[in-house]
From Swiss-Prot:
Annotated catalytic residues: 209, 341
Cofactor binding: number and manner: Binds a second Mg(2+) ion via substrate during catalysis.
One GO molecular-function entry: magnesium ion binding
Function comment: Catalyzes the reversible conversion of 2-phosphoglycerate (2-PG) into phosphoenolpyruvate (PEP). It is essential for the degradation of carbohydrates via glycolysis.
Binding site for (2R)-2-phosphoglycerate: 167, 341, 370-371, 392
PANTHER family: ENOLASE (PTHR11902:SF1)
Keywords: Cytoplasm, Glycolysis, Lyase, Magnesium, Metal-binding, Secreted
Gene Ontology terms: biological process: glycolytic process
Annotated source species: Petrotoga mobilis (strain DSM 10674 / SJ95)
Name of the protein in question: Enolase
HAMAP family found in the cross-reference section: Enolase
Pfam family, one: Enolase_N
EC number: 4.2.1.11
Length: 432
């Protein structure tokens, strides 16, 4: 018998709600020692077309078609039978059994939401069985790096009902010595931004990810407001706090005309690149995600060749946490960073594989939430486990976002003097 062995004795799933009030899957795995682990999967709004399939019921009379009873039943009636009896400490095997059972490239038979819920719950159960925090179980003795938070404080695009094309305007408090100080600085900027927007007559209600969603004259105006908020909080833009953007460009790309619609103008990929470069030259922008359409490999490669030595270019919809697409990006030098979302690929093992491939090719990895989140803080442990250096988990409001920040505070506290906050050194894929 293997030295570390704790058998899965039951797997149960149920339908619960995410932060948007839509159903999602929660799974609970019980081991032979009586230990349990549970996990809830998130759900995205601006989804890449190459993502693994999130199985929804499609019954318009039940949660407006968004029910997940099919996925829940797949866990309870199909997956459980196959994973009961497996060793919970063999995560790769647990995941492989589920992937083989599904048998499709994009998990369309069982649903990525069904497989991932069990995958995450099994990892939690195994960690609990050993009495280890999840980040130590997943990452081992060297898990010690706290991430630079990329805080989405102004929302646009698919995440808000306003007129901004760019989906996320984020702050990155990279010029600090600890996660705790970085988080505080971010919160102070968030509150100052609220005061400034309020004073100038803007609505300060928040979007899906907890950021503000004002109607502004242009995307650049959002950056200007953030710069003012950083200064009002007593910090220096470009020294302590930097700016990041997620364009989510596939959302404003017209496949027929091959043009991008930004600030009311139709632009080619080359014109859009020049637009981004003009912003990068003007403001302390350190990271830019999904600047082009998810099929525009050429646009990415040309842009990364131009500015990849000074900006982190992150592929999200481009890669969908998929090693095959990531390998293509590596071959084409498409980006110098990848966004990591567990539910884009649908298992813990495949997520770790994507991170490993990125690291081997000197790319950074940004671990990310989805716009439809829950109280589950798995990604906070994951980002420390793999020493990723960056996390995207929303703004400084809404419990579904704060749950991750609070878990990171706990982890930093627990690691004590061994905790590392790399700050600007986390940007290793940008040629210094």
């Amino acid at each position: 018998m293997e030295k570390f062995y704790d058998e899965i004795v039951s797997v149960k799933a149920r339908e619960v709600l995410d932060s948007r009030g839509n159903p999602t899957v929660e799974a609970e795995v019980t081991l032979s020692t009586g230990v349990t682990g549970s996990a809830i999967v998130p759900s995205g709004a601006s989804t890449g077309k190459f993502e693994a399939l999130e199985l929804r019921d499609g019954n318009k009379d039940y949660y407006m078609g968004k029910g997940v009873t099919k996925a829940v039943n797949n866990v309870n009636n199909i997956i459980e039978q196959e994973v009961v009896g497996l060793n919970a400490f063999d995560q790769v095997n647990v995941d492989r059994v589920m992937l083989d059972l599904d048998g499709t490239e994009n998990k369309e038979n069982l649903g990525a939401n069904a497989i991932l819920a069990v995958s995450m719950a099994a990892a939690r159960a195994a960690a609990n069985s050993l009495g280890l925090p999840l980040y130590k179980y997943l990452g081992g003795v060297n898990a010690k790096v706290l991430p630079v938070p990329m805080m989405n404080i102004i929302n646009g695009g698919q995440h808000a009902d306003n007129n901004l094309d760019i989906q996320e305007f984020m702050i990155m408090p990279a010029g600090f010595n600890s996660f705790k100080d970085a988080l505080r600085a971010g919160a102070e900027v968030f509150h100052n931004l609220k005061n400034i927007l309020k004073k100038e007559g803007h609505i300060t209600s928040v979007g899906d990810e907890g950021g503000f969603a004002p109607n502004l004259n242009s995307n650049e105006e959002a950056i200007k407001y953030i710069i003012r908020a950083i200064q009002a909080a007593g910090y220096e833009p470009g020294k302590q706090i930097f700016i990041a953007m997620d364009a989510a460009a596939s959302e404003f790309y017209n496949e027929e005309t091959k043009k991008y619609s930004v600030d009311g103008k139709e632009m080619s990929a080359a014109e859009l690149a020049e637009y981004y470069i003009s912003l990068i030259d003007k403001y302390p922008i350190k990271s830019l995600e999904d600047p082009f359409d998810q099929d525009d490999w050429e646009g990415y490669s040309e842009f990364t060749a131009k500015v990849g030595d000074r900006v982190q270019i992150v592929g999200d919809d481009l890669y969908v946490t998929n090693v095959k697409r990531l390998q293509k990006g590596i071959d084409l030098k498409a980006t110098n960073s990848i966004l990591i979302k567990l539910n884009q690929i649908g298992s813990v093992t495949e997520t770790l594989d994507a991170i490993e491939l990125a690291y081997k090719n000197n790319m950074t990895a940004v671990v990310s939430h989805r716009s439809g989140e829950t109280e589950d803080s798995f990604i906070a442990d994951l980002v420390v486990a793999v020493n990723a250096g960056f996390i995207k988990t929303g703004s400084l409001s809404r419990t579904d976002r704060i749950a991750k920040y609070n878990q990171l505070l706990r982890i930093e506290d627990e690691l004590g003097s061994t905790a590392q906050y790399r700050g600007l050194n986390a940007f290793y894929s940008i040629k210094k």
